[in-house]
C-alpha cells in the first residue's frame, strides 16, 4: 500500500456499484471496510464488514459510527435507494451519511479525511423524492469535505437494477422495446472505469460536484441494440412503447416493489442519462472507455444470456401466481358447498369442518395473493406458497384421492405450480 492510500469505508457495498468499488479498491491496495444492511455475503467474499441499516434511526447518530471507524481514513458513499418512502429516502441519502461524515471527522486529523459520494446525473432538473434527497445529500457531503461524483448510466461485467433491465429489454423475444421514440441520449460508463476514477479522486480530490460518463454518446435504441449483439442475438423490430404506457408500467412496478421497474426509472429513460465529464474527470490518468469499446471487450457468457432472458420473468411469475391464488381464494370463499362436499363424502370429515377448511383456506390464499402483488417479503412468501400447495396436495390426497385421476389434471397440476414457486424463489434473490 502506498503512503497516499489507507483504509476506506464503503457505504452501500452490497449494491451493484458498491461491490465493484469494494473489489476494485481492494485490488488496488486499499484496505476496505464494506458496509451494508446485510453483510453475510461480503463476509464470505473476504471483506472486513460493518453491518448498518442506513434507513434506521440509529444509523443517523454520530454515536453509532464512532468506535466503528477505527483506522478509517477515507469514505466512499455508494448507498442509494431509487424508490422508497420519504422517510427512508431522506435517511439513506442525507441523515445517515451526515452522521458518518461527522464521525469520520472526529476520528483523527480532519484534514486527512477524504471521500467520494457516488451521486446521479440529472438530479438538478427533477423534483422526484430521489432527486431532492440526492441534492440534499450532496450539500451535506460538500459541507464535510466529501466530493460528490455524479455518474451517468453505469454498466459492468455483472448487472443489477437498471443495468439488468437494459439487458432484459435488449434480449426481449421477437421485438426490442424502447421507451418513447428510443432516441434519448446516453453515455454509459463502465463500473471498472468508475472505480479507477474513484481511486484516483480519493487521493487527488477535486473541488465541488464532479460528473463522470463515457466519451461515446448513443441513443437508447443504439445502446440496447449493442447489448443485443453482445448477447449474440439476431436483430428484431424495435417496439416503441408510448410514454403513457411506460409510466403506467412504472406505477405497477412501484406498487409491486420491482426496483428498476418504477416511475423514477421511466422518467430517466424518457429524458436519457447524459453526463458531462468535469475537468477533474477529463484529467484522469486513465480515461473511461466508450460504450462500444467496453461492451465488446469480453464475450457474453451463458449466464449473461440466461439472466437477461429470465429477468422479466420475475414480475410475470408474481402476477401469474397472484392470479392463481386470487382465483383459488375466491373459489374457497364462495363455492357452494354442494359443489365440493360430495368429493369428500365417506372420508369421515364432518361437513362443518370441511366448510371451515375451505373458507379459511380461501382467506389464506387471498392474503398470499396480496403479498405477491405488494412484493412483501417475496422469498419467505415463496416458502409459504410451497407449504400451502404441499398442504393442499396432501390433504386432498387423503380426503379425495380421486382428484389425482381427473381428466384435466386435478392435483397433478400442483407439481408445475411448485416448480414455478421454486423458480420465483431463485429469481427474487437479485444479489
Give each language-model segment a name.
Residues 81-82, 91-152, 156:
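Conserved Rossmann-fold NAD(P)-dependent oxidoreductase catalytic core, especially the SDR/UDP-sugar
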Residues 262-337, 352-367, 373-431:
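Extended, low-polarity transmembrane helix blocks
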Residues 30-37:
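Conserved glycine-rich Rossmann-like NAD(P)H-binding loop of the short-chain dehydrogenase/reductase
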Residues 8-28:
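N-terminal Rossmann NAD(P)H-binding glycine-rich loop of SDR-like oxidoreductase domains
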Residues 200-261, 275-314:
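Mid/C-terminal beta-alpha module of Rossmann-like enzyme folds, strongest
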Residues 164-187, 229-273, 339:
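Alpha-helical membrane-targeting segments
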Residues 40-99, 103, 121-126:
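NAD(P)H-binding glycine-rich loop region in Rossmannoid oxidoreductase-like domains
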Amino acid at each position: 500500500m502506498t503512503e497516499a492510500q489507507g483504509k476506506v469505508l464503503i457505504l452501500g457495498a452490497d449494491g451493484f456499484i458498491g461491490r465493484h468499488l469494494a473489489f476494485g479498491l481492494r485490488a488496488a491496495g486499499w484496505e476496505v471496510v464494506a458496509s451494508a444492511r446485510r453483510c453475510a455475503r461480503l463476509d464470505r467474499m473476504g471483506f472486513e464488514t460493518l453491518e448498518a441499516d442506513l434507513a434506521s434511526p440509529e444509523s443517523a447518530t454520530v454515536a453509532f459510527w464512532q468506535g466503528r471507524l477505527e483506522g478509517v481514513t477515507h469514505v466512499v458513499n455508494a448507498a442509494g435507494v431509487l424508490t422508497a418512502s420519504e422517510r427512508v429516502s431522506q435517511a439513506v441519502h442525507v441523515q445517515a451519511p451526515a452522521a458518518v461524515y461527522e464521525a469520520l471527522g472526529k476520528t483523527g486529523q480532519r484534514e486527512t479525511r477524504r471521500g467520494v459520494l457516488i451521486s446521479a446525473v440529472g438530479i438538478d432538473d427533477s423534483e422526484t423524492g430521489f432527486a431532492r434527497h440526492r441534492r440534499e445529500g450532496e450539500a451535506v457531503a460538500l459541507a464535510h469535505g466529501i466530493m460528490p461524483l455524479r455518474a451517468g448510466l453505469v454498466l459492468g461485467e455483472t448487472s443489477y437494477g437498471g443495468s439488468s433491465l437494459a439487458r432484459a429489454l435488449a434480449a426481449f423475444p421477437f421485438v426490442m422495446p424502447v421507451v418513447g421514440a428510443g432516441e434519448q441520449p446516453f453515455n454509459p460508463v463502465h463500473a471498472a472505469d468508475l472505480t479507477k476514477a474513484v481511486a484516483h479522486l480519493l487521493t487527488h480530490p477535486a473541488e465541488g460536484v464532479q460528473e463522470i460518463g463515457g466519451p461515446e454518446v448513443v441513443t437508447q435504441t443504439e445502446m440496447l441494440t449493442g447489448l443485443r449483439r453482445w448477447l449474440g442475438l439476431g436483430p428484431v423490430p424495435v417496439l416503441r412503447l408510448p410514454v403513457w404506457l411506460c409510466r403506467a408500467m412504472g406505477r405497477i412496478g412501484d406498487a409491486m416493489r420491482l426496483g428498476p421497474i418504477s416511475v423514477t426509472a421511466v422518467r430517466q429513460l424518457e429524458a436519457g442519462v447524459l453526463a458531462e465529464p468535469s475537468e477533474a474527470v477529463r484529467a484522469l490518468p486513465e480515461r473511461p472507455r466508450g460504450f462500444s469499446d467496453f461492451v465488446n471487450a469480453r464475450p457474453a457468457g451463458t449466464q449473461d444470456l440466461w439472466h437477461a432472458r429470465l429477468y422479466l420473468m420475475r414480475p410475470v411469475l408474481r402476477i401469474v401466481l397472484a392470479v392463481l391464488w386470487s382465483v383459488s381464494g375466491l373459489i374457497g370463499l364462495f363455492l357452494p358447498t354442494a359443489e365440493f362436499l360430495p368429493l369428500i363424502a365417506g372420508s369421515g370429515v364432518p361437513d362443518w369442518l370441511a366448510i371451515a377448511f375451505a373458507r379459511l383456506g380461501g382467506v389464506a390464499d387471498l392474503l398470499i395473493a396480496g403479498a405477491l402483488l405488494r412484493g412483501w417479503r417475496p422469498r419467505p412468501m415463496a416458502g409459504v406458497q410451497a407449504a400451502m400447495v404441499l398442504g393442499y396436495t396432501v390433504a386432498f390426497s387423503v380426503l379425495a384421492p380421486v382428484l389425482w385421476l381427473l381428466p384435466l389434471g386435478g392435483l397433478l397440476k400442483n407439481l408445475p405450480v411448485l416448480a414455478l414457486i421454486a423458480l420465483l424463489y431463485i429469481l427474487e434473490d437479485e444479489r
